[in-house]
UniProtKB/Swiss-Prot annotation:
Taxonomic classification: Bacteria, Pseudomonadati, Coprothermobacterota, Coprothermobacteria, Coprothermobacterales
An example Gene Ontology molecular-function term: tRNA binding
Domain of life: Bacteria
Any single biological process term in GO: translation
Assembly information from the UniProt record: Part of the 30S ribosomal subunit.
GO cellular component, one term: ribonucleoprotein complex
Role played: Involved in the binding of tRNA to the ribosomes.
Family of this protein: Belongs to the universal ribosomal protein uS10 family.
Species name: Coprothermobacter proteolyticus (strain ATCC 35245 / DSM 5265 / OCM 4 / BT)
Family annotation (NCBIfam families): PRK00596.1 (NF001861), rpsJ_bact (TIGR01049)
UniProt protein name: Small ribosomal subunit protein uS10
Length: 102
């Protein structure tokens, strides 16, 4: 019989905020007696936008902007009911996107 597991994927533009949130989730899970694998850093998505500097002429003059999406993965193995309720009541910053998979 396979063990029950909760997979949490965190995404954010700010890596410091992301690491703090991952640390809080791991602390809550360990405090309630569940086994934790992670946080595992996933590849960073990098999006580059190319914009012309002038609105009229000179197409050769362009500017590049980039935005990076940092990601982490946390697996909680054999979670108890207390673990699930504590994770649901956990307050995390607004800049962190969370996806849960049971």
């Amino acid at each position: 019989m396979s063990a029950q597991r909760i997979r949490i994927k965190l995404r954010s533009y700010d890596h410091r905020l992301l690491d703090q949130s991952a640390k809080r989730i791991v602390e809550v899970a360990k405090r309630t007696g569940a086994k934790v694998a992670g946080p595992i850093p996933l590849p960073t998505d990098r999006r580059v936008y190319c914009v012309t500097r002038s609105p009229h002429i000179d197409k050769d003059s362009r500017e590049h902007f980039e935005i990076k999406m940092h990601k982490r993965l946390i697996d909680i193995i054999d979670p108890t009911q207390e673990t699930v309720s504590n994770l649901m009541s956990l307050e995390l910053p607004a800049g962190v996107d969370i996806h849960l998979k049971l």
